[in-house]
C-alpha cells in the first residue's frame, strides 16, 4: 500500500520529504516492513513515479528485490517471510491528489471511456484499421489526451444508475478540478452526451474551490470581489457537486475540517456577540479592534459599490475594472 504525506499549510515540500524519510526509517526498523520512497521523497529519478515503483506488483517482488537497482529504501533488503506476509509499502511527499468523478447523462461505459481517453494525459492507443500501431521497439504508440497530470477511466455506477468518468488529478497546479470538468463537458458535448454534475471522493483544498468559482465568474463576466462563502456556493453549483447527494463544505473542504475544533476567534463572532464581548469586563476587544472593524465596514461599502458597478447595465465593458477593485476590498 502507499502512505503519502501531503503538505497543507505552514510547511514546505522539502520539510515534508524529510518527515517521509523519518517515517520510512521507523516503519522499517519498528515494523520490519520494507518499502520505497516515491515522488518528492524519491531517492532516485527511477523511483519518482509510483507506477514504476509498483511495477511487478506483489507477485513480482521476489524477482524485483533480487535486482541491485531495486533494493528497498527502508526495512529488510532480502525477500523474507515478513515480505511474504506484508508485501512492501511506498511512502512519499507529494502534492494534493484529487479523486474526482464527472457524471454523464448516459449508462454507456464505452462512451464514458471514450471521453476519458480524450482527456487523460495517457490518451488512447493509436489504431490504424482497428490494429494498434507499434513503435520501433514494439511498444504501442499512443495519442495523448487533452490534459496533463490526469488519469481517467469510464465506468458505470450501479448505486446511481449512471456512467461516470473517474479521474485522479495528480497535480492540481497543472490541471485544476474546474479545468477537468470544463474539458470533459466539451468532449462529452462533441460525442452527443451531457455532463450533469460531478462528485468529489474525499477532501478538497479550499483554493481549488475558490479557483473554480473565479473561473466561472470570469466566464459570466461577473465580479470576483465576493465573499468566500458565496464563492463556495458558486463552485458547488458550477461543478454540480450536489448532483448526486448533498455537498457540505464544512465536511468536504480540508481547511474547514481542520479548523472545525479550533477556538472561536473574534472574526467569527456575530455583530451582536462582538458588541456584547466589547461591553463585557474583559480588556479585549478594545479600541484597536473597534477601529479595525469600523475601517472594515468602510472598505465593505467600497466593495459594494464596485460590485454593483460591475453588474450595472451599460457598463459591461468595465466589469473587469470594477471586479479588480471589489477583489481588493475582499
Residue ranges and their predicted role:
Residues 188, 219, 309-310, 315-316:
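Short, intrinsically disordered/low-complexity patches at protein termini
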Residues 2-273, 280-281:
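Long, contiguous binding/interaction regions
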Residues 311-330:
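A structural-propensity feature for long, helix-poor, extended segments
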Residues 8, 283, 306-314:
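Short, flexible helix-adjacent loops and helix caps
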Amino acid at each position: 500500500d502507499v502512505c503519502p504525506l501531503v503538505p497543507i499549510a505552514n510547511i514546505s515540500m522539502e520539510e515534508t520529504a524529510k518527515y517521509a524519510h523519518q517515517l520510512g526509517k521507523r516503519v522499517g526498523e519498528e515494523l520490519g516492513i520494507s518499502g520505497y520512497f516515491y515522488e518528492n521523497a524519491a531517492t532516485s529519478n527511477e523511483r519518482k513515479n509510483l507506477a514504476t515503483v509498483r511495477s511487478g506488483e506483489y507477485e513480482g517482488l521476489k524477482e524485483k528485490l533480487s535486482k541491485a537497482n531495486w533494493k528497498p529504501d527502508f526495512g529488510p533488503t532480502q525477500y523474507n517471510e515478513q515480505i511474504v506476509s506484508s508485501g512492501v509499502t511506498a511512502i512519499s511527499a507529494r502534492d494534493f491528489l484529487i479523486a474526482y468523478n464527472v457524471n454523464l447523462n448516459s449508462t454507456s461505459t464505452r462512451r464514458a471511456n471514450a471521453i476519458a481517453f480524450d482527456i487523460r494525459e495517457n490518451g488512447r492507443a493509436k489504431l490504424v484499421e482497428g490494429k494498434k500501431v507499434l513503435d520501433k521497439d514494439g511498444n504501442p504508440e499512443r495519442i495523448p489526451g487533452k490534459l496533463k497530470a490526469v488519469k481517467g477511466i469510464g465506468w458505470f455506477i450501479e448505486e446511481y444508475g449512471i456512467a461516470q468518468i473517474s479521474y485522479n488529478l495528480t497535480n492540481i497546479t497543472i490541471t485544476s478540478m474546474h479545468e477537468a470538468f470544463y474539458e470533459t463537458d466539451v468532449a462529452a458535448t462533441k460525442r452527443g452526451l451531457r455532463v450533469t454534475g460531478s462528485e468529489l471522493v474525499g477532501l478538497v483544498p479550499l483554493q481549488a474551490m475558490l479557483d473554480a468559482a473565479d473561473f466561472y465568474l470570469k466566464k459570466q463576466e461577473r465580479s470576483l470581489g465576493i465573499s468566500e462563502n458565496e464563492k463556495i456556493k458558486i463552485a458547488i453549483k458550477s461543478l454540480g457537486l450536489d448532483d448526486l447527494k448533498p455537498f457540505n463544505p464544512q465536511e468536504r473542504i480540508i481547511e474547514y475540517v481542520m479548523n472545525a475544533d479550533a477556538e472561536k476567534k473574534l472574526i467569527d463572532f456575530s455583530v451582536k456577540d462582538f458588541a456584547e464581548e466589547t461591553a463585557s469586563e474583559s480588556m479585549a476587544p478594545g479600541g484597536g479592534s473597534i477601529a479595525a472593524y469600523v475601517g472594515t465596514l468602510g472598505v465593505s461599502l467600497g466593495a459594494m459599490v464596485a460590485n454593483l458597478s460591475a453588474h450595472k447595465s451599460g457598463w459591461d465593458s468595465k466589469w473587469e475594472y470594477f471586479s479588480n477593485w471589489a477583489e481588493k476590498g475582499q
